[in-house]
Curated annotation (Swiss-Prot):
Annotated Gene Ontology cellular component terms: extracellular region; membrane
Entries under CDD domains matching the protein: DPBB_EXPA_N
InterPro entries the UniProt entry points to: Expan_Lol_pI (IPR007118), Expansin (IPR002963), Expansin/allergen_DPBB_dom (IPR007112), Expansin_CBD (IPR007117), Expansin_CBD_sf (IPR036749), RlpA-like_DPBB (IPR009009), RlpA-like_sf (IPR036908)
Keyword annotations of the record: Cell wall, Cell wall biogenesis/degradation, Membrane, Secreted, Signal
Coiled-coil portions: none
Domain Expansin-like CBD: from-to ranges: 172-251
Primary location: secreted
Annotated gene: EXPA20
Protein source organism: Arabidopsis thaliana (Mouse-ear cress)
Protein name per UniProt: Expansin-A20
Leader sequence segment: 1-24
UniProt keyword Secreted present: yes
Protein transport among keywords: no
Expansin-like EG45 domain mapped to chain residues: 48-162
Length: 256
């Protein structure tokens, strides 16, 4: 190969490397974050919130949770999503080296129309803002910080065990909370099947609670779950015929 072709090949190589690097960096989006606090000002770990997960200290993500502003929460469809977050561009508040943490979307951060979106109304539409649990916030920034600039990107959720189906309702109102979801974590469709019925679509009630006006008492239950990314998994006979409201049963798990 003559020198001209070698130089051209080398030039193309560096261009492709730069394009790959730019694409990787484009995965990160700009937002802001604050530490989730109780009314008395003490830091707290969210306990379920608008996604309905309950006591997060019992979850597989060990308190690494986040409440999302309305633009990110998307009326509950983002519940269960996993976000990698890092503090950037603030030498005083960001931890050295800009380490990142992975959080699970578990709550809604409500707007405050009485305050400016630049001071206090962090979750006003259309701001992209995360309210982080104590473990998550202190993993990337100083606790004393009031509001920090961050970058975030969606990542796959690493979960131990199978999908969890928590049952509630009555003889004419059947509801299931779906949690511990792997891959993108965002459930967009659910079907239920009793041993005497066909697959029946369920509707999102709130967060990751799905419901249907069915009487399935006394039937074994199977569930079909579809993620935002398009993958579907069916867990057959998850709950036996003698299942009870208030119980949680485990099914299959999504894997990449």
């Amino acid at each position: 190969m003559d020198s001209g072709l070698q130089q051209l090949a080398l030039c193309l190589f560096f261009i492709l490397c730069r394009l790959f690097q730019a694409t990787a960096e484009d995965d990160w989006k700009i937002a802001t974050a604050t530490l989730s606090r109780d009314r008395d000002g003490s830091s707290s770990v969210a306990t379920g919130g608008a996604c309905g997960y309950g006591d997060l200290r019992q979850s597989s993500f060990a308190g690494y949770s986040a409440g999302l502003s309305g633009k990110l929460f998307n009326r509950g469809s983002s519940c269960g999503a996993c976000l990698e977050v890092r503090c950037v561009n603030h030498i005083r508040w960001c931890l050295q080296g800009s380490p990142s943490v992975v959080v699970t979307a578990t709550d809604f951060c409500p707007p405050n129309s009485g305050l400016s979106s630049d001071y206090g109304g962090w979750c006003n539409f259309p701001k992209e803002h995360l309210e982080l649990s104590h473990a998550a916030f202190t993993g990337i920034a100083e606790t004393r910080a009031e509001m920090i600039p961050i970058q975030y990107r969606r990542v796959k959720c690493g979960r131990r065990g199978g999908l969890r189906f928590s049952l509630s309702g009555s003889s004419h109102f059947f509801q299931v909370l779906i949690s511990n979801v792997g891959l993108d974590g965002e459930v967009v469709g659910v079907k239920v099947k009793g041993h005497t019925t066909a697959w029946i679509p369920m509707a999102r009630n709130w967060g990751q609670n799905w419901h249907s006006s069915l009487d399935l008492i006394g039937q074994s239950l199977s569930f079909e779950v579809t993620l935002k990314g398009g993958k579907t998994i069916a867990s057959y006979d998850v709950a036996p015929p003698y299942w009870r409201f208030g119980m949680t049963y485990q099914g299959k798990q999504f894997h990449s």
